[in-house]
Curated annotation (Swiss-Prot):
GO molecular function, one term: protein-membrane adaptor activity
Membrane topology note: Multi-pass membrane protein
Protein name: Golgi to ER traffic protein 2
Record-stated family: Belongs to the GET2 family.
Gene Ontology cellular component annotations, sorted alphabetically: endoplasmic reticulum membrane; GET complex; Golgi membrane
GO biological process: establishment of protein localization to endoplasmic reticulum membrane; mitophagy; retrograde vesicle-mediated transport, Golgi to endoplasmic reticulum; tail-anchored membrane protein insertion into ER membrane
One Pfam family hit: GET2
Subunit structure: Component of the Golgi to ER traffic (GET) complex, which is composed of GET1, GET2 and GET3. Within the complex, GET1 and GET2 form a heterotetramer which is stabilized by phosphatidylinositol binding and which binds to the GET3 homodimer.
Basic and acidic residues: bias regions: 1-17, 44-62, 71-80
Length: 280
């Protein structure tokens, strides 16, 4: 049996009235608007009391800041004290103030050793010099200086005897037998320069052969490890100057200069000896 539209509306009206009578509509309305039983948060932000922040007195903050600054200063000072570069410059400043003495450490050796550790502010050239025992270096210098002195003494004795042979024609110093066995080239005054130059070349060659033997025994290079000029040139970075292998060229120039200096010294000795012998 089908119901008419009027009957359907009547039945729906009765059902709604029954629901309202049970209070279901009021409960849903309260949930929507935030009433009793609502799931919405009805707490207002204005109802909350602000948190009270306790103010720290400035007198309490200032000591803390001072203590932190003081701690930073102390840590910085300690780091500087532990820095080997700072310690090196401090020692150099003390040496300049007190004056150099025999116990003053070698500046170039210290900088060279510092560069070898990688802490040096000065960039070194590609040719790095290995650290050598200072006592071994001093022993090598002693051997080389002794060899130089002995070589010079022997040369001057031979040159002085040769000068006597040329300038004194009587038999007071050289008997006739000695003169008779010597070739004429040694007794002729015109050949003095040739004999002198030949003698210098032979003496210099023997000297350098003996010095190479000393280097092999001690393991120290005379110019590379003991010359302060070479140490200074080694601090120049490669490429700054338009000269390839600057250190090697300086070493070669110093070798030639040593030869020339020895010859100049011998020439001066010969001139003085000739002047003295001629007065006898």
């Amino acid at each position: 049996m089908s119901l008419s539209e009027a009957e359907k509306r009547k039945i729906l009206r009765e059902r709604r009235q029954q629901k309202f009578s049970r209070g279901g509509a009021s409960e849903r309305l309260n949930k929507i608007v935030g009433g009793q039983g609502s799931q919405l948060d009805t707490k207002s932000a204005l109802d909350e009391k602000p948190e009270v922040v306790e103010e720290i007195p400035r007198e309490a903050v200032k000591p803390e800041m001072n203590s932190s600054v003081q701690a930073k200063k102390e840590s910085t000072a300690q780091a500087k004290a532990e820095d080997p570069q700072v310690e090196l410059f401090r020692q150099l400043a003390e040496m300049q103030g007190q004056g150099a003495t025999e116990s003053t450490p070698d500046l170039f050796s210290m900088m060279k050793n510092l560069g070898a550790t990688g802490d040096s502010p000065f960039p070194m050239a590609e040719q790095q010099v290995e650290a050598i025992d200072p006592e071994l270096v001093e022993y090598h210098k002693y051997r080389v200086n002794t060899l130089t002195a002995k070589t010079t003494l022997v040369k001057w004795i031979v040159l002085l005897a040769y000068i006597f042979l040329l300038t004194r024609t009587d038999d007071t110093y050289f008997p006739f037998v000695v003169r008779s066995y010597l070739p004429e080239v040694f007794t002729s005054q015109s050949s003095f320069f040739s004999i002198f130059l030949t003698f210098e070349i032979l003496a210099t060659s023997i000297y350098y052969q003996l010095s190479v033997g000393v280097e092999r025994e001690t393991g120290v290079k005379t110019l590379q490890d003991t010359s302060k000029i070479v140490s200074l040139v080694s601090m120049v970075p490669e490429g700054i100057l338009p000269i390839a292998d600057l250190r090697g060229k300086v070493i070669l120039a110093m070798k030639y200069w040593n030869i020339i200096a020895m010859m100049i010294g011998d020439v001066c000795f010969v001139l003085v000896a000739i002047g003295l012998v001629s007065q006898i």
